[in-house]
């Protein structure tokens, strides 16, 4: 196939239409409203101002991580090291705070970001530079980083007494009576990333790479750079999420956020970011995080065992993947039919 024709094939794929506001996000939002209403019937406190603040606060860490890995999933990759990075960031920041009582919340975020940056660079070099499968690489770094948490922590725990007052006060800050500071930051990050993915060449390239990686290579898209930076971004978001974790719980140990990576992946996939690549938005990912957390809140109100809550998360993930596959097949058929009509 001539290079120009191949480039046209990549740039005119269905991913362009998926950048527009889609009915999927609207449908997810409606489902979220129904889920919130249903949970409110089970637990009336859920619909109060305190209940709303609790929901948004508890969703902040997962939502921020969902924003971080959404571009990676769009490019047909995955990052399973995020939960371990959250744990490492949270513990190291707490350790610095305990040893430096004069630390401010700004310094906490800087340290958390640097830790996440280091993990992101490692993942990016291995996946983009050596072209190793992201699933294998990040599964490896998941265990490496979690092992590092166990080693550096040496079974030492930290609580609110060792945290800077400015950080804890920021974690308690609420706007308009129901919007926590952490979720306000999630909203800002979501808007900025949504604009980046939709209106910049780098963002559009991510969709093209995810739609057809070999073709993206052939037409000269900067696959290495885009992939590397996506993993770096995910790492930084995980580092910041570690500080969010501290702000929420005001305590940390070596098991912080253990095993939560699949909850984030579930939120992203349920939010419409297909694991087949080339489709999805960060807005959908955040709605997915809210939906998962709302369902978990409803299950907790019903007294459902933690094991069954995890099982339901897995079931939701499978359903979302199946729905993505059905939609992908339908879109392929529609696109093929359209091309046939154009040639007649």
Residues covered by each model-derived region:
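Helix-loop-helix "hairpin" substructures at the membrane interface of multi-pass membrane proteins
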Residues: 103-112, 118-123, 127, 175-252
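Transmembrane helix-bundle core of multi-pass membrane transporters
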Residues: 134-199, 226-229, 248-257, 333-344
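Single transmembrane alpha-helix segments in multi-pass membrane proteins
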Residues: 33-101, 125-131, 268, 272-282, ...
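Inter-helical junctions in multi-pass inner-membrane proteins, predominant
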Residues: 42-54, 149-156, 174, 196-203, ...
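Transmembrane alpha-helical segments in multi-pass inner-membrane proteins
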Residues: 238, 248-314
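Short loop segments and helix-boundary regions at transmembrane helix junctions
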Residues: 14-20, 73-78, 117-160, 196-201, ...
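Cytosolic-side transmembrane-helix boundaries in multi-pass membrane proteins
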Residues: 1-37, 218-225, 299-344
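Loop-to-transmembrane alpha-helix initiation sites
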Residues: 105, 134, 178-186, 227, ...
